[in-house]
Amino acid sequence: MHPNMKMWIGWAACAFLLFACLGTLTEGYPTKPDNPGEDAPAEELAKYYSALRHYINLITRQRYGKRSSADTLISDLLIGETESHPQTRYEDHLVW
């Protein structure tokens, strides 16, 4: 085999593995519910809106814990407000 052909086989294998990994990541993401249409009965529309609300809550939920980066953690610890010393709403005090 030529060195150029080995390189192309290597790139093809890497691309295949990349697409396989991306495929497994998208399977974990929730799917959007199907719209029943404008002329659907009220019961189906209620089920659809309930499923849609659940879907939106899943994809927009806040994530805590290990997903926080060290930079934001340090800045929250240094600048964050506490119950005994809350931050003011205005950075500069008004001068009369």
UniProtKB/Swiss-Prot annotation:
Which Pfam families does this UniProt record tie to the protein? Answer: Hormone_3 (PF00159)
Q: Does the keyword Signal apply?
A: yes
Which residue windows are transmembrane per the record?
Answer: none
Gene Ontology MF term list:
neuropeptide hormone activity; neuropeptide Y receptor binding
Q: Does the keyword Signal apply?
A: yes
Signal peptide span:
1-28
Compartments (UniProt record): Secreted
What Gene Ontology terms describe where this protein resides (cellular component)? Answer: extracellular space
Q: Indicate where the modification Tyrosine amide is found in the sequence.
A: Y64
A single GO BP annotation from the record? neuropeptide signaling pathway
Question: What keywords appear on the UniProt entry?
Answer: Amidation, Cleavage on pair of basic residues, Neuropeptide, Secreted, Signal
Entry's family note: Belongs to the NPY family.
Q: Function of this protein?
A: NPY is implicated in the control of feeding and in secretion of gonadotrophin-release hormone.
Which named protein is this?
Pro-neuropeptide Y
Lineage summary: Eukaryota, Metazoa, Chordata, Craniata, Vertebrata
